[in-house]
Amino acid sequence: MITSENTDNRATNLYKPSDIEGKWQKIWEDDNLYNTDEQASNKEKFYALSMFPYPSGNLHMGHVRNYVITDLIARFQRFQGKVVLHPMGWDAFGLPAENAAIERGINPDKWTKQNIAHMKSQLKLLGLSVDWDREFATCDENYYVWTQFLFLELHKAGLVYQKESEVNWDPIDNTVLANEQVDSEGKSWRSGAIVEKKLLTQWFLKITDYAEELLQDLEKLNEWPERVKIMQENWIGKSIGTNINFKIKEFKKEKIQVFTTRPDTLFGVTYLAISVNHPLIKKISDNKILSKLENLKIYLQESKDKDQKKIGIPTNLIAINPINSKEIPILIASYVLDEYGTGAVMGVPAHDERDFEFAKINSIDIKQVIIKEKDKITSQLTNAFTDNGFLINSNNFDGLNNSDAKKHISEHGERNGWAENKIQFRLRDWLISRQRYWGCPIPIIKCTNCGSVPVNKKDIPVRLPNEIKISSNKINSLGSNQSWINTTCPKCGNLASRETDTMDTFMCSSWYFLRYPSSKSLTKPFEKEKINKWLPVDQYVGGVEHAILHLLYARFLTKALRDNNLFDIDEPFKRLLTQGMVQSAAYKNSITGKYISPTDIKDITNPKDPKDNSKLEVLFEKMSKSKYNGIDPESVIKKYGADTARMFILFKAPPEKDLEWGDSDVEGQYRFLCRIWKLFLDYSNNDITHEADKLKKENESSLLKSINIAIKEISNDIKNNQFNTAISELMKFYNSISSNLNYVNKDLRRESLMKFCILLAPFAPHISDEIWHLIGNSKSVHLEKWPVFDEDALKENSFELVIQINGKVRDKINVEINISDDEIKEKTLIRPNVKKWIDNKTIRKIIIVKGRIINIVV
């Protein structure tokens, strides 16, 4: 409980965050102040969530920004009288933990849990209003059992399947590598081996079944940043076009199908291009062609410029254009992707820049079939014509604009059986298999009789084995643990083996927000009624780097689980805020490309390389150990306090913009809190003079107006995520209180200070509670209601009248709004500054512009 005994801290006149912040954090925790009140059924709910952190071991300023923003929003919503769910957890599986454990020779579980404990203590230093009772980590058995349960639900719904897929394979370490483990030269980050492509049987989720809904429902997300929606729209990549079948001259029963959005250019097709793994390749027996093909595959694996160089290998096979029966060559092309469309494209050099370049390099005909102006033939093309226009060289379709021609040629193809209208998506199914130890085991048993059989739900979790072996700088995969692998088939009872792949960590992080409302449930992943109550998340906060994968996977799983009747919501996140990066000054030698630590620089105002005395380039870049520009949050909190760190993070830049760290800006926020501290301490010690003869109506009017302006502007700014301008308004409000406090009645003094406390509280919660108690309150300021502004108090009751003599400004005066013209003249003519300009002169005319100006013509 909060008592005067544990909150009275008037012994010092100095603001010392270390004296108050730990104290208030303990009080809040002891009083369960931020535990979600599930019994408050009469209150409106608000679910505030940050993207949960990976437990790397140390908090960085990017974390601080993310969690402080969400905390401010959660606190503001509590002040609105809402019951707030603001939880925290840990995205704990994955390759970084496995690699870190290998380097240290310990179990990833031990390393991860040590990091969680340390990072949790760091997060608590920030004074976050988190409900820690709902905490979990994705590596907890009581969490990943439900990840496996959801996998089985998706399997039952027909959304899980296996197929062969290409992976990055390290031939020295004999392991699969994630894309980020392959460097820019196509080499393994660990062994240095040239990474190979290898076909492995992998598990997939059918996210493509939801492509159309994922695309269409972006329109519902009107509180998401537009750029994130555009990124998802492009990733889903819907194309409306036509599938066209080309016969192959040499193989009468074979056809090549291509997808195109430009059937209007069909008469201009002069070649077909197929990918290096197209099924037609199997029909090729010419050793010279196959040798070139192998060289091309190696080039595509190794080259980072594969999209720049257009390599073509003639197959000596001929396709027949169905629209005009023309024979066209088939080439294997470096730019055709296996995974998009049909693995074959039609080449129209005259009307596609890539095809034009490819045709020039490979000596292929270029045939123009669209011109800009009707009946006006252009000279030979020097580059591709990609604008709209009219058809030429297209038989019966000549003269049509290309928009109409698309429709007519598609219909012609459908009637003749070689074309079909088709909607295609760029989105591919989600590959969730990982050949690593530290992940959620896939609950599948492989039986020689029954094939791949799902584990019975009563037998989950399939636990990770505790005993691991670290050899050759890697943790042996699950496949090397025979006692773990060997089991019996749930279907036939024969000896069988477990699936040795683990799940992509995105599988664990794509449903965690569903777990928080019932995080301690031992019988189900979540309770339907609680999901329907709390979801969607009202405010989700995280980096824009998660715009596609995490956010798209989370949307997909939500829709798939809804269709399994596990709850009724369509979208997981109502409102999304993607915060910018935190950047800091980095010092780079532009000649060597090396970064220099600021501790090695003698004069930071004129930075030079200590080795060669060359001038260093100063860059503001994302904080990084390798660039020596990281700022340790704990050291900042130790020096200035958590409230200062919070105020700086919120004030320095709008949340969606990148933020540049500056020590002077941090010190500026600290000084502001020091001034606040002194003001309230003086008031509590009766050091502010209150003589009745000093009371002035204009001061009271000014302060009352400032109170209401502050409430209105700060409220609107927080609602609109304009936290930096909200702090600017707090500063203005503070200045008004400081200027007027000696000259207003005691009730208004107290009202202004109390409302300032509440308005400050979401930004700087510790000092707010301390000064709240300094002025005589007993309960926490965080239990108060947010003040409401009085519209009448904002109405102007006076204005500044500009006084001109012969059109030149000579004076200004404040007058009441409803003043009459006669009163304006009277007040103006007695002003000393006016008298000296009109004495001994004849006033010819007085012009009054209502509410603005009086001009005296003499």
From Swiss-Prot:
Sequence similarity: Belongs to the class-I aminoacyl-tRNA synthetase family.
Transmembrane segments: none
GO biological process, one term: leucyl-tRNA aminoacylation
Keywords: Aminoacyl-tRNA synthetase, ATP-binding, Cytoplasm, Ligase, Nucleotide-binding, Protein biosynthesis
PROSITE patterns (UniProt xref): AA_TRNA_LIGASE_I
GO CC list: cytosol
Known EC number: 6.1.1.4
Stored HAMAP family: Leu_tRNA_synth_B
InterPro entries: aa-tRNA-synth_I_CS, aa-tRNA-synth_Ia, Leu-tRNA-ligase, Leu_tRNA-synth_edit, M/V/L/I-tRNA-synth_anticd-bd, Methionyl/Leucyl_tRNA_Synth, Rossmann-like_a/b/a_fold, tRNAsynth_Ia_anticodon-bd
UniProt protein name: Leucine--tRNA ligase
Keyword Aminoacyl-tRNA synthetase: yes
UniProt binding sites for ATP: 625
Species whose genome carries this gene: Prochlorococcus marinus subsp. pastoris (strain CCMP1986 / NIES-2087 / MED4)
Pfam families, per database record: Anticodon_1, tRNA-synt_1, tRNA-synt_1_2, tRNA-synt_1g
A molecular-function term among this protein's GO annotations: ATP binding
Motif range ('KMSKS' region): 622-626
SUPFAM superfamilies xrefs: Anticodon-binding domain of a subclass of class I aminoacyl-tRNA synthetases, Nucleotidylyl transferase, ValRS/IleRS/LeuRS editing domain
Reactions mediated catalytically: tRNA(Leu) + L-leucine + ATP = L-leucyl-tRNA(Leu) + AMP + diphosphate
Top-rank EC class of the record's enzyme: ligase
Sequence motif: 'HIGH' region, positions: 53-63
Lineage of origin: Bacteria, Bacillati, Cyanobacteriota, Cyanophyceae, Synechococcales
